[in-house]
Amino acid sequence: MTQFFEGNGAVATVGEQAVSDLIFGVDSASPANVMLQNNLSMLEWVTRNKVYPVFWGRNLNGDGCLTAQEITYLYLAGCKIAAIYVPDGERNTEEKGAQDAAAALKLAEDLCIPRDAAIFTETNDTETTAYLKGYAQG
């Protein structure tokens, strides 16, 4: 038996094991408001089985990135947004981390994302501690 509920402290069952404080979110390359072939939006398709994401992760930059219209759509649906910046080039100096943080902040400001909102960065195995420090402090 598998059951999932909202991430508001409700108990979910996975197999026979109870899981409390389950937080479900989505990280998608596709906009939440894109219409699919079944005439549902991506968000509607995700929630069709009563699984409601607490957050929807979307890239601030790159192809098909987050838009103001999608922000409004998610806001009206009661879903928080995890804004993700995807850096390019080498990620090995504190200066580059600070530059990427500044670029991420500019993109967020352009979308009217509040200044106190967290902006995540996509990471892989090439970032250095110095880069991440620069990004966090930037």
Model region roles, listed by residue range:
Residues 1, 5-13:
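Non-catalytic propeptide/linker segments at domain boundaries
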Residues 15-38, 50-134:
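Substrate-binding cleft of extracellular glycoside hydrolase catalytic domains
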Residues 42:
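Non-catalytic, usually N-terminal nucleic-acid engagement modules in DNA/RNA processing proteins
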Residues 137:
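Acidic, glycine-rich loop-and-strand cores that form catalytic or ligand-binding grooves
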